[in-house]
Amino acid sequence: MPVSETTDRQASNGGDGPALPINELFYSLQGEGKLAGTPSVFVRTSGCNLRCWFCDSYHTSWEPTHATMSVDDIIAEVQSYEHADHVVLTGGEPLLHDDAVVLLDRLAALGYHTTVETNGTIHRDAPIDLASVSPKLASSTPTAETDPKGDGEWAARHDARRIDVATLGALADDYDTQLKFVVTDPSDMPEIESLLAEIRTATDTRIGDEDVVLMPEGTTHAELDARRNEVATLAMEHGYRYTPRLHVALWNDAPET
């Protein structure tokens, strides 16, 4: 079950020590990107500085829910999954939280391989093995027509915040990085190409086409079926990687997958 449904918000806080707002903590397979198929513990924080209309973790952004868990308790829960040595810190936007660095430091000291899934608008100095950076394209903006709450109130804020080229460049300079783009349809490609050119100019690190990942938007079998082949074709045409959403293919839209 999601942590927020099983843990008292204050009881797990551990006093004044480092803690994070945790929406879910579970064991599954990494479903996306270079490490797809890897057994992983997912630590999902709540809270985000953006509002993608298609957000697949609605209760970390549009209606955030969480339990406050101490870093000690998070580590204990991670260690209870004995077959996983890979931890995915995700959200929401996990790098919003100062104590994400404390958690990553602790995980590194214990020998875990870590992926941080981020929208690329925040940089922190932390031991991150793979920065899975998903810049948000214009097609993610919650207009009045696509806003799940129906009013488009977040459109201007989201659009103003969604791309920070300097931060994207800094992440690429400091970490092993994959750039993962959520593709809604072929009209996203010109923006992807333009943004890639800007990021490559902003970094001293080579970003190869093999570091660019195209992923179809969708959280159900039906939604992925409608886009999968089209996005795979785009990946081949441009020389980029294609990633499935393996967890959706296996478990549809079930929670904690």
From Swiss-Prot:
Binding residue positions for Mg(2+): S57
The residues covered by the Radical SAM core domain are 35-253
List the molecular function annotations (GO) for this entry.
4 iron, 4 sulfur cluster binding; carbon-nitrogen lyase activity; magnesium ion binding; S-adenosyl-L-methionine binding
In the UniProt record, the signal sequence range is none
**What does this protein do, in the record's words?**
Catalyzes the complex heterocyclic radical-mediated conversion of 6-carboxy-5,6,7,8-tetrahydropterin (CPH4) to 7-carboxy-7-deazaguanine (CDG), a step common to the biosynthetic pathways of all 7-deazapurine-containing compounds.
Assembly and partners are described as: Homodimer.
Q: What is this protein called?
A: 7-carboxy-7-deazaguanine synthase
Q: Which organism is it from?
A: Halobacterium salinarum (strain ATCC 29341 / DSM 671 / R1)
Its lineage reads:
Archaea, Methanobacteriati, Methanobacteriota, Stenosarchaea group, Halobacteria
